[in-house]
Amino acid sequence: MAETRKTRPVSWIKAALKDFREFPEGAKGILLGALTIAAEGGKADIAKPLHGLGSGVLEIALAHRGDAFRIVYAILLADEIWVIHAFQKKS
């Protein structure tokens, strides 16, 4: 019998989703792909732990067409992923 993979739900803080929607389409696609990997229990190559914020808090960092985009997400004990911040890095 084939093994079924459990995909964690991804929830968004309202402000993070609003900011994410302003990202260019190409950047959104790549970042959503990285979030999908996290939801399936993996870690994308462009994701790294954010030290000092507790275990399970990670940042997805993307350089896209000369700009830098970030998503910060947390994996909760209830096996949920929460996107808590999305922003375009200015410097």
Indicate residue ranges for each PLM-predicted region:
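Basic, Lys/Arg-enriched alpha-helical interface segments
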Residues: 1-68, 77-81, 88-91
